Amino acid sequence: RLCWFCACHTQGTRTLSPVESYIETLEAELSLMRATIPSGLRMGRLHWGGGTPTILPPHLIHRLSRAIRAVFPAHDLFEFSVEIDPTMVDRAKIDALAAEGMTRASIGIQDFDPVVQAAIGREQPFAVTKACVDDLRAAGITSLNTDLVYGLPHQTLARIEDTIAKVLSFAPDRVALFGYAHVPWMSKRQKLIDESALPDDMARYTMATAAATLFADAGLTPIGIDHFARPGDTLDTALRTGQLRRNFQGYTADTCQTLIGLGASSISRFPAGYAQNAPATAAYIQRIEAGEFAGSRGYTLSDEDILRARAIELLMCNFRLDLAELQAEFGPRAAALTPVLEGIA
């Protein structure tokens, strides 16, 4: 299924055949990686997302995990997070993911109200989600992340408060609270959403602030602009120790500057810049089958880009900028931001 509110690159399928073929292409891309990367690299984090990895049956879960580990052996402090669709997972899939080392499950909830769910093309009953959470806990998955969205069609303060009460009953370790971005010119499926049912700016603000209060009252620590974490979670620890980071997926405790993306439309981050694979699945497969990487565009960061990116990250993580801190990291180059700091002081 394709949820109407999502602006990410996804593709629906009703049979397993294209999924199996896609796994073969991922294996081919990994083989190209093996022949290119330096020896001795170890993987600290692994994330399966970009739709729902739980479309994979257990045998393909094992197959993909082993293919990745054959190229990128796991670090001692390895973390493995997986996006879970409660309507497309069962205990056998959860057990397979747990056997492959999954440490964190991430469940996209958005809103539990059936009126809101119908308006965004995503049916996900609370009872089904609770059963999924129970299975995850029973399988030994100790870290649970939930994603909520405010600003959805027909969403009201009462409805989002009811959703949050249900989410808190799961005792999540992390919560991400994102604002819905209505961009139908970028994501054609969003044209299925009734624009007249979208909350106005003041209603969005009221929902966001009320949600933040409810999470804080439940004992979760506010993390940056849109995340919350239980005390003792690695995000909470990273915030307190100055190690919190922000990437294009959200907040993270991972300070590594290298992120390697696999698959169609995936984005890789390196100390020197970014690279993205071909967004179209057919184009991605064609490039990999030709024995070449599928990169379609990239961006090389200048020294000033890196400095400004770090300054923005510090603001998003800590809500403050310290020139001395930037000088300790960048040396004399940090002085280039002095006019900016003076302007916002």
Label every model-predicted segment.
Residues R1-T10:
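Local cysteine-cluster metal-coordination motifs and their immediate loop/turn environment
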Residues P332-G343:
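Short amphipathic alpha-helical interaction segments
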Residues T10-T36, L41-P332:
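C-terminal scaffold of the Radical SAM
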Residues Q327, I344-A345:
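C-terminal extensions of enzymes
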